Amino acid sequence: MSTMLRIVVGSILLAGAGVCADVVVDQKDRKFSKTEVTIKPGDTITFTNSDEVAHNVFSVTPGLEFEIHRQAPNERSTIAFPKEGVVEVRCSIHPRMKMIVTVKK
């Protein structure tokens, strides 16, 4: 299943499961606006790109992998985090960009 399809299906399933929070994390000056975020299972993070360059946000944390692929300036993408874990989020274009997402009840 493609990443985008998983995001859409996950979002639809989570919409009926109760109230979920959405945290917005901006990308500007080749860094994330937040270096650490704590959310609950089912919550989402919307990654916005306010930078003048493209980004490629991803995680290879086992069981919580995702990849947004090339995100052009002014684009936004939402990722659902369905289960508990500590997720390292990076940008493959700018290796110094890093944030930690802690998903816990």
Where are these regions (language model features)?
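Extracytoplasmic copper-binding redox domains, predominantly the cupredoxin/blue-copper superfamily
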Residues: 5, 11, 16-105
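N-terminal secretory signal peptides that target proteins for export/translocation
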Residues: 1-3
